[in-house]
C-alpha cells in the first residue's frame, strides 16, 4: 500500500496559496484492508474512506470508463493493480494531475509542473471530452487563477467548443450548473467565468439571457464601451471589488437583462428595461434553481437600479416607498446591497472605473434617517391598527424631506 497527496492540495501549495482540503490516493490496497486499518467507507459509487483521526478523504486508485451520457455516465474500476499514473490520467487538468509522496517528492506524469510554470490550464487526455461538467470547471479555474495570469490552452478551449457544439452540456442538471456558477462568483474575477463560457459557446446554452446582451448597443454618451454584454461583465468585475457577497455579484450580473428584450429599431435606448428584466431574472433563476434570497435581490436590483441613479430627483415619498418595496424594514441589508450594485453599474463602464457614486451615500443616509423614526412614539401617541403604519410612514416621509432639504443637492 502506498499513499499519495493529490490534486488541489499539491497544486495550491506549489502556487504558494493556502491549502484548504487535502485529498489522498491509496495505491495497491483493497476496501477490506482500508476497513481493517480503521478507515470509514463513505463512497457509494467508488471506494472513498475517511481517515480515523484526520477525517480527510482517502480514495483507492481508480480508472473511469464512459458508459452513459453526461457527467454521471461513468463506470469506475478500483483495484490493487491500478497505478498512480492511471488514477491521475482520469483527472481534468494537468495542474490537477500532480501527486506528492511521503518524502515530499512530486510525481508529475502529465507535465503539470510545466503548465503551472507557464500558467496554462490544459486537459490531461481526450477523456476530458466525456464529462460536460469539466467545461464549467475549467471556466471556474480560469476565474479563480486569473489574477495569477493563467489562461486556457488553445487545444483545451477548442475541445470545450466541440463538447458544447455536440450538445454535451444539455446533460448537466440545473443544480450542478448553479453550484459551479456560485463557486465561480466567489472568485476574485468572476467575470472571467462568463467570458470563458462565451468563448466556447456555452453561455448561449446555459445563460441565454446573458448571452443575448452581447451586441446590444447602449448610448455611447453613458456607455463608452457601447456593448451591453461587455458592460455586464465590467459591472460584475466591479461588484467583485466592492463586495464578497454572492448575492450582490449575481444581482449585478442580472441588472440589465431587460436590455436584451429591446427591439433593435429602438436601440440604443432601453426605456423600461429594469421592470422588463425582472421576468428574465425569474426565468433564469427558476431554470437554475437559484436560492430564493439570491433571486429576490436580483429581481429588486433589476427593477430599481436606474431609480437609484436619479436619487436627487426623487421626492421623499418615493424614497420611503422604495424602502417599502425592497422590504428594508425587515431586511435592512438590502439597502447596502442595492447601493453596492448600483455603484458597480455606474463604475462598470469604460473610463468610469474610479468614479464617485454619491447616490449610494445618499441612499444610505436617507435609510438611516427613515429607520430612526421610532415606532414606539407613534403607538404612545394613540394610533391603532392600520393607523400606526400610516402615521409611521407620514413621519418617515417628513424626516426624509427634512434631511433631503439639508443634505441632498438639488437636481439640476
UniProtKB/Swiss-Prot annotation:
GO terms for biological process: RNA repair; tRNA 3'-terminal CCA addition. ATP binds at residues 8, 11, 91, 137, 140. It holds the Pfam family HD. InterPro entries: CCA_bact (IPR012006), HD/PDEase_dom (IPR003607), HD_domain (IPR006674), NT_sf (IPR043519), PolA_pol_head_dom (IPR002646), PolyA_RNA-bd (IPR032828), tRNA_CCA-adding_enzyme (IPR050124). CTP binds at residues 8, 11, 91, 137, 140. It comes from the Bacteria. Keywords: ATP-binding, Hydrolase, Magnesium, Metal-binding, Multifunctional enzyme, Nickel, Nucleotide-binding, Nucleotidyltransferase, RNA repair, RNA-binding, Transferase, tRNA processing. The keyword ATP-binding applies. Its cofactor is Mg(2+); Ni(2+). Mg(2+) binds at residues 21, 23. Magnesium is required for nucleotidyltransferase activity. It catalyses: a tRNA precursor + 2 CTP + ATP = a tRNA with a 3' CCA end + 3 diphosphate; a tRNA with a 3' CCA end + 2 CTP + ATP = a tRNA with a 3' CCACCA end + 3 diphosphate. Coiled coil: none annotated. The keyword Transcription does not apply. Gene3D superfamilies: Beta Polymerase, domain 2, cca-adding enzyme, domain 2. Residues 228-329 form the HD domain. Monomer. Can also form homodimers and oligomers. Catalyzes the addition and repair of the essential 3'-terminal CCA sequence in tRNAs without using a nucleic acid template. Adds these three nucleotides in the order of C, C, and A to the tRNA nucleotide-73, using CTP and ATP as substrates and producing inorganic pyrophosphate. tRNA 3'-terminal CCA addition is required both for tRNA processing and repair. Also involved in tRNA surveillance by mediating tandem CCA addition to generate a CCACCA at the 3' terminus of unstable tRNAs. While stable tRNAs receive only 3'-terminal CCA, unstable tRNAs are marked with CCACCA and rapidly degraded. Belongs to the tRNA nucleotidyltransferase/poly(A) polymerase family. Bacterial CCA-adding enzyme type 1 subfamily. Comprises two domains: an N-terminal domain containing the nucleotidyltransferase activity and a C-terminal HD domain associated with both phosphodiesterase and phosphatase activities. This is Multifunctional CCA protein. It comes from Escherichia coli O6:K15:H31 (strain 536 / UPEC). The gene is cca.
